[in-house]
From Swiss-Prot:
Superkingdom of origin organism: Archaea
GO annotation (BP), single: translation
Function statement: Binds to the 23S rRNA. Forms part of the polypeptide exit tunnel.
Organism lineage: Archaea, Methanobacteriati, Methanobacteriota, Stenosarchaea group, Halobacteria
HAMAP family the UniProt entry points to: Ribosomal_eL39
Name of the protein this chain belongs to: Large ribosomal subunit protein eL39
Organism: Haloarcula marismortui (strain ATCC 43049 / DSM 3752 / JCM 8966 / VKM B-1809) (Halobacterium marismortui)
Length: 50
C-alpha cells in the first residue's frame, strides 16, 4: 500500500470511467440491441492488473 504515481492514478481513473453502464439513450437508439456493457468489472471480484 504505497503511494500511487500520477500514471497509475490516470489508468485507474480510466478504468473507473469505463466501468459504467450503457447509457439509456444508446439502448433506445439501437432498439435494445445493445443492453449490457460486457466490460463491467466488480471492484472486489475482478482484477484490473494495476
Amino acid at each position: 500500500m504505497g503511494k500511487k504515481s500520477k500514471a497509475t492514478k490516470k489508468r485507474l481513473a480510466k478504468l473507473d470511467n469505463q466501468n459504467s453502464r450503457v447509457p439509456a439513450w444508446v439502448m433506445l437508439k439501437t432498439d435494445r440491441e445493445v443492453q449490457r456493457n460486457h466490460k463491467r468489472r466488480h471492484w472486489r471480484r475482478n482484477d484490473t492488473d494495476e
